[in-house]
Curated annotation (Swiss-Prot):
GO molecular function, one term: ATP hydrolysis activity
Region (NBD1): 160-341
SMART domains registered for this protein in UniProt: AAA, ClpB_D2-small
Protein keywords: ATP-binding, Chaperone, Coiled coil, Cytoplasm, Nucleotide-binding, Repeat, Stress response
NBD2: annotated span: 555-765
Binding site for ATP 2: 605-612
Residues that, per the record, bind ATP 1: 207-214
Protein name: Chaperone protein ClpB
Region annotation (Repeat 1) ranges: 6-71
Region of interest (C-terminal), ranges: 766-874
Residues in coiled coil: 392-524
Length: 874
């Protein structure tokens, strides 16, 4: 016996059989040991051959058990194993059988045949008793081999290659495992047309990710099963190749190629009956490529060109261009079929077709309006993905969220149960008390507990009943789907009696039961059982941060009072606050142009009048966070080449992979305020980039991604024309100098840029009477800083007036006041705190002196109400 003539699998089995013999205490290595490890193998090649040859695997195992128990056992021996005469004959016969069949290696099936043929071996008797004959085994082996010989040490891994490395889509379609494919008739027809050609009959489905390329292949499988295809494709098998399984575990050089050749050989042997579907077709290029080895695409080319291999590929536009088009010889063997993104209307039809599958899976109902909302909202707000995939995901997640709520305890019941627990704890504490008041309280608690427990039991029963009702509806849907699948199979197989029973008996009965179950509307139901547009909108809001869900009463009031809220932070600029508020209200009411940003404004005015502060106040109002905005200081973009910092460097330049400051921020958070500060400082070319943003609400970054700006508020600030605004009188209207200011603005910016901005807002200089309110705002901020030390500031009216007068400078706005407060309030306070004059928890009264402020600390008078953080008010 030459062990090198045996395949790796057989060598492994011989080794396992030796280990088994030693562990059993047998000194002789017999055929029974070999058959035992062959039959118990996980992959089950031997067991499968026995079954296919008409044998009973259970009987083989029982016979083996009996034979192995009769073998002589030795304990305390020297672990020496001797080859028995029958096993030597079995090995010799296996080598002879392999040689006659033209095999270079002895394989598992040849060894099994030898075990059945060798009369001196007990295994022949066992297999014969279980109904296995050598003739039947040879017939099954020839069917499995399909004329191939064992030319390598890993020959067994190539048997039934299609079963191992491909999935039968037509079989899945027959079993009803595939989702229905709605629409896409044109693409499926075009695919069938290419498949019906004589040569190069290989379509490749090319389209963006998520448009339904794989669904078209599944649609083709469904059509083949239903017989809705031309004669040339009738009864064909559509097999989806699993590239991962092909490559996985191919350790040795040439093993991957061997597996792929085995797959191709099976497809070719089927004489055109098998169509191979290769999803992510670009993975063929370079798959299995090592030094000197051929990759998968080169192995496929000859068969593709001759028309021996029917193949349907699917890949994205980008990957087709990147991998397949570079290999012209591979590209010419495929005929492209372009798959476009479906329209919103088509997506709604697709969702309606899939609705039942999702209802059955999540055990909730999905309203038709939720499907319409999913298609429309995903199309509008999720711009970096494609229909129908993103709409299907929305419905799936909305149904999943609702199912979680159904499985959780209802809020009403949860509150009662918590109250019961609280009262039980109180009752136990009162039981040890002996006074009359405690006894009285105990009686009241007992009564309340009994009422609450009764209510809890009632609500729990109601909740369980509602859950059960939902489960029943889902169960009926599943039975209905199974019945419809059975009807389709019966019609295909010509079993008309069974089809009649299903079509006119079982299915109508199930439909009636389902309609009855769904029509029982529960008044005052504890559970929400239907996915509505609101649920879909909530999911969109979670994904993108864009508030598309229905406004709650509180938010409506807040939006209507927006001017007052922002006015608490921005003083004296009523027109600007009003313009911003109107834009936000338009957007939240759904009345803004869907293809433009929520609002785009240029704020013009002298320094320190609140241009940047208004932007911060808006961000704080919308997101409860001052920092929820992208602030871009345009003084950093003075050179022409700095444009690439906004949108990302083009290919070939350093920093290409990093993306742009502006585009990356908006891609990550599509709903936010964007502030371009001091816009006149930027290079004129920067404004060219903004033209598309202001007009169409989109911008293409350096990597070719389209970034959506339709949910942003764009604010640009500038000091242009400030000299006219500064010289205005206290009570003069800003409109009187608008023409002068606009003249300066037009000289700096191009008409096409100014024409795209929604509104140019002029900020007038601050009036003297505005200063008091600004002092209050600044002092509030200082108070917030001191809140950790529990120090309360009490600013008297005279001190307030003193600060307002000293900090007022019409040319510089509110910034001088900030400096005055720093010098006259913060500096003295800091010194007094460090000296220990002002202790933690003190109240400090601030009054005005002749040339400075006076601070009078009153110890231990800290105000219990912690000061409200100023930016939380907005």
């Amino acid at each position: 016996m030459n062990i090198e003539k045996y395949t790796e699998r057989v060598r492994g089995f011989i080794q396992s059989a030796q280990t088994f013999a030693l562990s059993s205490g047998n000194q002789q290595f017999t055929p029974e040991h070999i058959l035992k490890v062959l039959i118990d193998d996980d992959e089950g090649l031997a067991a499968s051959l026995v079954e296919r040859a008409g044998g009973r695997v259970g009987d083989v195992r029982m016979g083996l058990q009996s034979a192995l128990e009769k073998l002589p056992k030795v304990s305390g021996g020297n672990d020496q194993l001797y080859l028995s005469q029958p096993l030597a004959k079995v090995f010799s016969l296996a080598e002879e059988l392999a040689s006659k069949a033209g095999d270079s290696f002895v394989t598992v099936e040849r060894l099994l045949t030898a075990l059945a043929m060798e009369k001196s071996a007990k295994t022949s008797e066992i297999l014969s008793a279980a109904g296995v004959t050598p003739t039947a085994l040879n017939r099954v082996i020839n069917d499995m081999r399909k004329g191939r010989t064992a030319d390598s040490a890993s020959a067994e891994s190539n048997y039934d290659a299609l079963k191992k490395y491909a999935r039968d889509l037509t079989e899945d379609a027959r079993a009803g495992k595939l989702d229905p494919v709605i629409g896409r008739d044109e693409e499926i027809r075009r695919t069938i047309q290419v498949l019906s050609r004589r040569t190069k009959n290989n379509p490749v489905l090319i389209g963006e990710p998520g448009v339904g390329k794989t669904a078209i292949a599944e649609g083709l499988a469904l059509r083949i099963v239903n017989g809705d295809v031309p004669e040339s494709l009738k009864d064909k098998q559509l097999m989806a190749l699993d590239m991962g399984a092909l490559i996985a575990g191919a350790k040795y050089r040439g093993e991957f190629e061997e597996r792929l050749k085995a797959v191709l050989s099976e497809v070719q042997t089927a004489a055109g009956q098998i169509i191979l579907f290769i999803d992510e077709m670009h993975t063929l290029v370079g798959a299995g490529k090592t030094d000197g080895a051929m990759d998968a695409s080169n192995l496929l080319k000859p068969a593709l060109a001759r028309g021996e291999l029917h193949c349907v590929g699917a890949t994205t536009l980008e990957e087709y261009r990147k991998y397949v088009e570079k290999d012209a010889a591979l590209a010419r063997r495929f005929q492209p079929v372009f798959v476009d993104e479906p329209t919103v209307e088509d997506t709604i039809s697709i969702l309606r077709g899939l609705k039942e599958k999702y209802e059955q899976h999540h055990k909730v109902r999905v309203s038709d309006s939720a499907l319409v909302a999913a298609a429309m909202l995903s199309n509008r707000y999720i711009t970096d993905r494609f229909l129908p995939d993103k709409a299907i995901d929305l419905v799936d997640e909305a149904a999943s969220r609702l199912r979680m709520q159904v499985d959780s305890k209802p809020e009403e019941l949860d509150e009662i149960d918590r109250r019961i627990m609280q009262l039980k704890i109180e009752r136990e504490a009162l039981k040890v008390e002996t006074d009359a008041a405690s006894k009285d309280r105990l009686q009241r608690i007992e009564k309340e507990l009994s009422d609450l427990e009764e209510e809890s039991a009632e609500l729990t029963a109601k909740w369980q009943a509602e859950k059960q009702k939902l489960g029943l509806a889902a169960d009926l849907k599943r039975q209905l789907e199974e019945a419809r699948n059975a009807l389709a199979i019966a019609q295909r197989n010509g079993e008309f009696q069974k089809a009649g029973e299903l079509a006119y008996g079982t299915i109508p009965q199930l439909e009636k039961q389902l309609a009855d179950a769904e029509s029982q509307e529960n008044k005052g139901s504890l559970l929400e059982e239907t996915v509505t547009p609101d649920h879909v909108a909530q999911v969109i809001s979670r994904w993108t941060g864009i508030p598309v869900d229905r406004m709650l009463e509180g938010e409506r009031e807040k939006l209507l009072r927006m001017e007052d809220e922002i006015g608490k932070r921005v003083v004296g600029q009523g027109e600007a606050v009003q313009a911003i508020s109107k834009a936000v209200r338009r957007a939240r009411a759904g009345l803004q142009d869907p293809n433009r940003p929520i609002g785009s404004f240029i704020f013009l005015g002298p320094t320190g009048v609140g241009k940047t502060e208004l932007t911060k106040a808006l961000a704080s109002f919308l997101f409860q966070d001052d920092t929820a905005m992208v602030r871009i200081d345009m003084s950093e973009f003075m050179e022409k080449h700095s444009v690439s910092r906004l949108i990302g460097a083009p290919p070939g330049y350093v920093g290409y992979e990093e993306g742009g400051v502006l585009t990356e921020a908006v891609r990550r958070r599509p709903y936010q305020v964007i502030l371009f500060d001091e816009i006149e400082k930027a290079h004129p070319d920067v404004f060219n980039v903004l033209l598309q943003v202001l007009d169409d609400g989109r911008l293409t970054d350096g990597q070719g991604h389209t970034v959506d700006f339709r949910n942003t508020v764009i604010i640009m600030t500038s000091n242009l024309g400030a000299e006219y605004l500064v010289n205005l009188g206290e009570n003069d209207d800003v409109e009187t100098v608008r023409d002068d200011v606009m003249g300066v603005v037009r000289a700096s910016f191009r008409p096409e840029f100014l024409n795209r901005v929604d509104e140019i807002i002029l900020f007038h200089r601050l009036r003297r009477e505005d200063m008091g309110a600004i002092v209050d705002i600044q002092m509030q901020r200082l108070q917030y800083l001191l809140s950790d030390r529990k120090i309360t500031l009490q600013l008297e009216d005279d001190a307030r007036e003193w600060l307002a007068n000293k900090g007022y400078d019409p040319a510089y706005g509110a910034r001088p006041l900030k400096r005055v407060i720093q010098k006259e309030v913060q500096d003295p306070l800091a010194e007094r705190i460090l000296l220990g004059d002002i202790l933690d928890g003190s109240l400090v009264k601030i009054t005005a002196g002749s040339d400075r402020l006076n601070f009078r600390p009153i110890s231990g008078a800290f105000s219990a109400a912690e000061p409200e953080r100023e930016d939380e008010k907005a």
